[in-house]
UniProtKB/Swiss-Prot annotation:
GO terms for biological process: RNA catabolic process. Pfam families: DEAD, Helicase_C. NCBIfam families: PRK04837.1. This is ATP-dependent RNA helicase RhlB. A motif (Q motif) lies at residues 9-37. It is found in: Cytoplasm. ATP binds at A53, Q54, T55, G56, T57, G58, K59, T60. GO terms for molecular function: ATP binding; ATP hydrolysis activity; RNA binding; RNA helicase activity. Residues 428-438 have a biased composition (Basic residues). The keyword Nucleotide-binding applies. It comes from Shewanella baltica (strain OS185). Residues 395-438 are annotated as: Disordered. The gene is rhlB. It catalyses: ATP + H2O = ADP + phosphate + H(+).
């Protein structure tokens, strides 16, 4: 994490439980991010908060530290049953729930608190076995949590801490009725520590907070600009016929260490995957139709570096916590201005530098004025020579073909026949076909 992203507040100087401090120190957490520095002193006084913070600001660790500290510092409710968690963390997506659980496990090492996770797309029985053994902190999506509550598999009578993450996204996805259903089955708001985080504290989000929380303190880390200064943006105006060749050419020029390519439709994403796979890249596909187990595997491969490129619809634009994404390519300009911000926000995180490259083709160019108005600046335009684009591109792969476990191709574009060579780990010589780097 870049030092520019951190505050001067040390975790060691906060009145945290010794086991929480030990877990933080062992995992390299020394200084707080701004949202952590503002929210933790409030939460450690057992006061509720409604926090405004973007993804990548450290809010996950803020509410996890507060949750663990609260449970370790508060007596277990009298008469608590094994099927009653003490804390519940609600997330809008499976991917976000999984990432939160991974971070929670880091803190759980020395605390003896059990962490459980539930979400749709996985076997009920497998998740139920974990719940039957008892969990202290339950993390999950609202739909699956409600299923288990209605079946009597879990009870909410012993809840002492509640986290609602990405509350604005919960509204977007229509989950607010589910959230209110769960809140009504918990102890009264003044008997638990309540935490809400949202990218925006709109009136509807604030209404939710005041309905189900105990006079929450508003904590805001609002960026001065909607897009990070760490992200270099550029936009091209390709024809629909040249978009794919331009993308493949730019990827060769940039040779990104880790990139996400966004498109607006599942069909377009599948087409992109086919061309990138056919061109020898290590690429994964993430859309709403991908089975959950495969989604998890793809994200793990992308995170670990087994895949270099992830092609995704906006299902992946929020809730993904993947470090070191160097490039984001908007193959299609999104219809929703906020989606543009969320997409490019996958890079340039935690003080790191990032690149955002967008295409304004005939179909989606009309979205650009609204996007630029929303982000309060014009996106610099880059030009290219059509004749300089790659021409000898391999045949696209079949979408149903099993992904090879081999390595990403490292091609010598200077040869007429474009012979392939396997990636050795070293960056290839840059081919500046579009003259962007001249």
């Amino acid at each position: 994490m870049s030092e520019t992203h951190l505050s001067t507040q040390r975790f060691a100087d906060l009145p945290l439980h010794p086991e929480v401090k030990q877990a933080l120190a062992e995992n390299g957490f020394e200084f707080c991010t701004p949202i952590q520095a503002l929210s933790l002193p409030v939460l450690l006084q057992s006061k509720d908060i409604a926090g405004q913070a973007q993804t990548g600001t450290g809010k996950t660790m803020a509410f996890l530290v507060a949750t663990f500290n609260h449970l370790l510092s508060t007596p277990v409710p009298e008469g608590r049953l094994i099927n009653q968690p003490r804390a519940i963390i609600m997330a809008p997506t499976r991917e976000l729930a999984i990432q939160i659980a991974k971070d929670a496990i880091l803190l759980a090492k020395h605390t003896h608190l059990k962490v459980g996770i539930v979400y749709g797309g996985e076997s009920y029985d497998v998740q139920r076995k974990v719940l039957d053994q008892g969990v202290d902190i339950l993390i999950g999506t609202t739909g699956r949590i409600i299923d288990y509550v209605r079946q009597g598999i879990i009870g909410l009578n012993s809840i002492q801490a509640v986290v609602l993450d990405e509350a604005d996204r919960m509204f977007d996805l229509g989950f607010i009725k589910d959230i209110r259903f769960l809140f009504r089955r918990m102890p009264e708001a003044n008997q638990r520590l309540n935490m809400l985080f949202s990218a925006t504290l709109s009136m509807k989000v604030q209404e939710l907070a005041y309905d189900h929380m105990n006079e929450p303190v508003k904590v805001e880390i609002a960026p001065e600009e909607k897009t990070s200064k760490n992200i270099k943006e550029e936009i091209f105006y390709p024809s629909q016929e040249e978009k794919m060749r331009l993308l493949l050419t730019l990827i060769e020029e940039d040779w990104p260490e880790k990139a996400i390519v966004f498109s607006n439709t599942k069909h377009s994403c599948e087409t992109l995957w086919s061309w990138l796979e056919g061109d020898g890249h290590r690429v994964g596909l993430l859309t709403g139709d991908v089975p959950q187990k495969k989604r998890i595997r793809i994200l793990e491969q992308f995170t670990s570096g087994q895949l270099d490129i992830l092609v995704a619809t906006d299902v992946a634009a929020r809730g993904l916590h993947i470090s070191d994404v160097s490039h984001v390519y908007n193959y299609d300009l999104p219809d929703d201005c906020e989606d543009y911000v969320h997409r490019i926000g996958r890079t340039g995180r935690a003080g790191n530098k990032g690149m955002s490259i967008s295409f304004a083709c005939e179909e989606y160019a009309l979205n650009l004025p609204a996007i630029e108005s929303y982000i309060n600046h014009s996106i610099p335009v880059s030009n290219y020579d059509s004749e300089a684009l790659l021409a000898d591109i391999p045949t696209p792969a079949k979408i149903h073909r099993k992904h090879p476990s081999g390595t990403r191709n490292l091609r010598d574009r200077s040869g007429a026949s474009r012979p392939g060579a396997q990636r050795s780990g070293a960056r290839p010589p840059r081919h500046d076909r579009t003259r962007r780097h001249s």
